[in-house]
Amino acid sequence: ISSRRGFQATDLALVAVFAALIAVLAVIPPIFMVGAVPFALQMIAVMLTPMVLGSVRGGCAIGLYILVGVLGLPVFSGGASGVGVLVGPTGGFLWGWLLGAFVAGAVATVVLRRRPRKSMLPVWLFLVALVDLVCVYLGGILGLMAFAKLSLNAALAANIAFVGLDLVKGILACLIATAVLTAFPRLMP
């Protein structure tokens, strides 16, 4: 992002492409199950977005995805749409995605501006994924408590089964981000 002129055409295109990637992966059914936990691809894109785009562009991409869903396009999980999703049982996760994009994107920007050794880049990006996951789970747990009226213990229990797979998705997002940022270093936030 140019500090003098705001968003450039490239920034807008990247925001739109990453919002579209998240939307497309939302409607693809889980590719397999691990016990009762589905392995859906959408969370990989959610974690990849701030790693590659940074805080502002990453937050805008997640925000655009949410806006498109709120305005009625069926881009939320299971083909859902509308403002009701934001205040439904899983709405907190969407809020967590937005928070995570800004916070993890800021961490990614700091990490990438320090120009870590290529061999260490995936490790640093995994740290970014962990920051993102903390924000997502924080939003999701608070959303379950507020919108589904679950207790803290019940909300934590509802999420525990997903943590392992989300860590695997974080590793995949790190590997993809490393490849993208190595091939296109000018994308770095």
Please annotate each region the language model reported:
Residues 28, 52, 78-79, 107, ...:
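Helix-loop junctions at the membrane-solvent interface of multi-pass transporters
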Residues 26-38, 66-100:
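Interfacial aromatic-anchored transmembrane helix boundaries in multi-pass membrane proteins
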Residues 1-59:
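Hydrophobic transmembrane alpha-helices
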Residues 16, 20, 24, 48, ...:
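Generic alpha-helical transmembrane segments of integral inner-membrane proteins
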Residues 1-2, 17, 24, 83-136:
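Short helix-perturbing small/polar motifs within transmembrane alpha-helices
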Residues 35, 110-188:
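Membrane-embedded alpha-helical hairpins and interfacial helices in multi-pass inner-membrane proteins
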Residues 12-17, 32-48, 59-64, 67-75, 102-122, ...:
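Hydrophobic alpha-helical transmembrane segments
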